[in-house]
Amino acid sequence: MDEKAAYFEHFPSLAGRTNRISYMDHTDHNPVKEHLMNEMMRTDLDLAILHHHGYFDTEYLNGTAPIRTVREAKEFIIRNVRMHVEEARERGRNYDSLRVVLEKRFDLPSTWLDDNPLADSLRIADSTLVANEDLHLEDFKIFGYRPNVPVVVIDACFCGSFHQDDCIANEYIFQPGSTVAVIANTVNALQDKWHDRFIGLTAQGGCVGDVVRFSNLLESHVIGDPTFRFAPVPGSVDVDGLLLQNKVSSWKKLLKSPLPDVQSLAIEQLR
């Protein structure tokens, strides 16, 4: 995985150490929500980077599960017809006349709609299925979701919309778990932006705020404590000390640093 190779450059101390970087593909499970929550509640993770689409109240995790059998195809069609029926009901349409229209439009056998699509049991089942595809604000309470990863990067639109009454990033911070800082986007985020730029500084004595400060992405913000830092790895360069002194001579020496993040920071400070 290319991204994993990049993280070994950000955090070279992890090279040769097994099981230090884990990866979850959203297509591994459908729905993946509970698997993701279980991973995020582990107490042995330091950093999580989440790639998905988002809104201020939602992490979009899954779409419709791939259809592999004829039965699944039939269930998918009937479920979508029920959605049409529900939307029409809200507009005051008559079900019997609508049924005739839908059977003709989608070339459906009349027996497929024998069950009452407006039955509460079916509506609840459909709503539950859709809700489980994504992670919502209320899921933190419903599932007792308490993230324990100290630093979380949410590479998605809107999840850091702090101007709303609540947002996904807020919930990561204010749960009883151990998450201290979340880097998230207030508005739309470019899909090709450099989401992990300078993330390696967190292993060199840099604080989370440094990552956002030097990334220059207008939509990204730290929700939580921007001064949070990890204990630096042995032989680190003490990023915060260098920034405090801000000596040109020191930055020039670091232009030859074997650490890409430190070398990039030196270029940033000298330009």
Question: Where are the regions that the model predicts?
Answer:
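Cysteine-dependent hydrolase recognition
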Residues: 1-271
